[in-house]
Regions:
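Hydrophobic membrane-insertion alpha-helices, especially the h-region
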Residues: 29-47
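Single-residue recognition of alpha-helix boundary sites
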Residues: 43, 56-57, 83, 263
């Protein structure tokens, strides 16, 4: 066989090997880029940004059912993950460091603390409401007007207001927190929002108000009335010092919102983050016979709307 033909075959083999090596390197680089992007997205979702949707009209018209929102999870603190990554299995969290404090009028996303007689809430149930009362504040509602520390608080500019009917003062609503009051959603309180380190005297007049919060702090039903004595964990108690900061929250559409009036206060460690922006919005109901598709179901004027 001539030498030239042997050399030509050898050169071809080398070119094929080089091509194979380059292809493998490109594949590895691509997979590495995908892996880095995945890890970055996972870190971002775990610690910084969360996406969620609005299912109800309780925050109308600030937020509408069908809005897709971004939540700043780092607005107040950085915590360890609340869930095992890529699952819905909740795990205990630990605060790593603080980045700020929730303020009145902040729109927050939080883990639902439970109904008014419920100590252990449902897992993975998140609510979105507006902070009205901060730790230590006194909140009262008179004929649908909210007062904090005796000062009238104006409604959010986009909130739905329905003045067609107001429940009279003294007409009790059995759904209202706490039990045993003559309050209703339009005439509520006054109630003091618990603050970490705040000590309250306990008596038969206020134990229904504070008992649930104390039970939740112990994560067990520890408050009891034994004859004429109030006990906590079996020991007589005339007072209690709160271990956490709490917030009183309301929906902007107050006539169609289940909020602190019905199930009590939100502890600070249940707050997920602050609502930032609407990044997408779809009408939840499209008129029958409308065949225009998704284009006309999008609320284009709400995309990139900042949440105030």
């Amino acid at each position: 066989m001539p030498d030239g033909e042997v050399k030509k075959e050898t050169d071809g083999t080398v070119e094929e090997k080089n091509s194979y090596v380059i292809s493998r390197l490109k594949s590895r680089q691509f997979l590495r880029a995908i892996l880095i992007a995945f890890i970055a997205a996972l870190i971002l979702k775990t610690f910084i940004i969360e996406a969620d949707t609005i299912p109800t009209g309780s925050m109308e018209n600030t937020l509408l059912a069908g809005d897709f929102i971004l939540i700043n999870k780092a607005a107040y603190e950085i915590t360890t993950p609340r869930f095992i990554p890529l699952t819905s299995i909740s795990i205990p969290t630990e605060k790593l460091f603080s980045t700020g404090s929730p303020k009145r009028n902040d729109v927050i996303v939080f883990k639902f603390p439970g109904y008014k007689n419920q100590i252990h809430p449902y897992d993975n149930l998140y609510f979105i409401k507006r902070i009205i009362g901060c730790p230590g504040d006194t909140v009262q509602i008179k004929d649908k007007v909210v007062y904090v520390n005796g000062k009238k608080i104006s409604r959010p500019p986009e909130a739905i207001i329905n003045n067609d009917y107001t429940m009279k003062k003294g007409r009790s609503d059995p759904r209202i927190f706490p039990d045993g009051t003559d309050w209703n959603s339009d005439n509520y309180g006054p109630v003091v929002v618990p603050k970490k380190g705040m000590t309250v005297n306990l008596d038969f007049g206020n134990i229904r108000e504070w008992g649930l919060i104390i039970d939740r702090e112990f994560n067990s039903r520890v408050v009891a009335i034994e004859g004429s004595v109030i006990t906590i964990n079996g020991a007589p108690a005339r007072s209690y010092t709160f271990k956490k900061n709490y917030y009183f929250v309301l929906g902007d559409n107050r006539d169609d919102s289940m909020d602190s009036r019905y199930w009590g206060f939100v502890p600070d460690d249940d707050i997920i983050g602050k609502a930032m922006m609407v990044y997408w919005s779809l009408k939840t109901q499209v008129p029958a016979g409308n065949n225009s598709g998704i284009f006309h179901s999008v609320r284009w004027n709400r995309i990139f709307k900042i949440i105030h």
